[in-house]
């Protein structure tokens, strides 16, 4: 299981939101490049970026920081937030990102996911953010009636790199992951699932091992110091998330 540190970007700074609330922002660093380099130094094998401005408005405002981070790191970097067009996804990949994460468009324009997955096999991730099991979009502002697991099933066989399953209720709370929701997601999809939301301790990380997720995104716990990345990697063991091309001989 791969442990993936998160950097959430808001107006060029590293921040964390509490349960996705833009009115509950904690700023951790004004230098996202330095922070990214620190996670790499501690042993991270992948970095997760979120463009919170893009997620909320659909307009990219953190591209300079994203470019600087990808240029500075030797580990792969993935990004989500505001990726709502073919042109935007391709622009981000041209920055040197390893993967782009499609959230809102996965529900609103599923054909775009299919198009990008075919064009960039193993580099497209679907982000499914859920509140009480139902998908939320546009920076977690808009609630829908779509079941998270149903959306995951929609993209079976496309050769996605992964699904990032975020539980909004636990995100930024350090209260522990929603194991029930994660089990349901793993059972619903053959695509590798990356857990996101609620990690507060190394014990929380260990609780994910029997669930079968391929990775876990950790944010606030690293910044608050309740999880030390180097210690967590030693406790859990850090394996690189296999992309779809290596985990199966052909799309199912």
Swiss-Prot record:
The keyword Amino-acid biosynthesis applies. The active site is at 8 (proton acceptor), 129 (proton donor). One of its GO terms (biological process) is L-tryptophan biosynthetic process. Its main location: cytoplasm. Pathway: Amino-acid biosynthesis; L-histidine biosynthesis; L-histidine from 5-phospho-alpha-D-ribose 1-diphosphate: step 4/9. GO terms for molecular function: 1-(5-phosphoribosyl)-5-[(5-phosphoribosylamino)methylideneamino]imidazole-4-carboxamide isomerase activity. InterPro entries: Aldolase_TIM, His_biosynth, HisA_bact_arch, Isoase_HisA-like, Isoase_HisA-like_bact, RibuloseP-bd_barrel. It is found in: Cytoplasm. Coiled coil: none annotated. GO terms for cellular component: cytoplasm. Belongs to the HisA/HisF family. This is 1-(5-phosphoribosyl)-5-[(5-phosphoribosylamino)methylideneamino] imidazole-4-carboxamide isomerase. The lineage of its organism: Bacteria, Bacillati, Cyanobacteriota, Cyanophyceae, Synechococcales. The gene is hisA.
């Amino acid at each position: 299981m791969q442990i993936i540190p998160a950097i959430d970007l808001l107006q060029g700074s590293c921040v964390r939101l509490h349960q996705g609330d833009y009115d509950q922002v904690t700023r951790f660093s004004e230098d996202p490049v330095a922070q990214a380099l620190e996670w790499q130094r501690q042993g991270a094998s992948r970095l997760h970026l979120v463009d919170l401005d893009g997620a909320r408005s659909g307009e990219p405002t953190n591209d300079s920081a994203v470019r600087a981070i990808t240029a500075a790191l030797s580990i792969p970097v993935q990004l989500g937030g505001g990726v709502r067009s073919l042109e935007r996804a391709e622009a981000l990949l041209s920055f040197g990102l390893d993967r782009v994460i499609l959230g809102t468009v996965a529900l609103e324009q599923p054909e775009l996911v299919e198009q990008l997955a075919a064009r960039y096999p193993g580099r497209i991730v679907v982000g499914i953010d859920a509140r009480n099991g139902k998908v939320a979009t546009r920076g977690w502002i808009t609630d829908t009636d779509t079941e998270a697991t149903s959306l995951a099933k929609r993209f079976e066989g496309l050769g996605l790199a992964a699904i990032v399953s975020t539980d909004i209720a636990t995100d930024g709370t350090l209260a522990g992951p929603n194991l029930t929701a994660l089990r349901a997601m793993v059972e619903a999809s053959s695509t590798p699932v990356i857990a996101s939301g609620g990690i507060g301790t190394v014990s929380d990380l260990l609780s994910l091992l029997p669930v079968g997720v391929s990775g876990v995104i950790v944010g606030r716990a690293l910044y608050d110091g309740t999880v030390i990345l180097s210690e967590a990697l030693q406790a859990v063991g850090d394996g690189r998330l296999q992309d779809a091309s290596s985990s199966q001989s052909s799309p199912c």
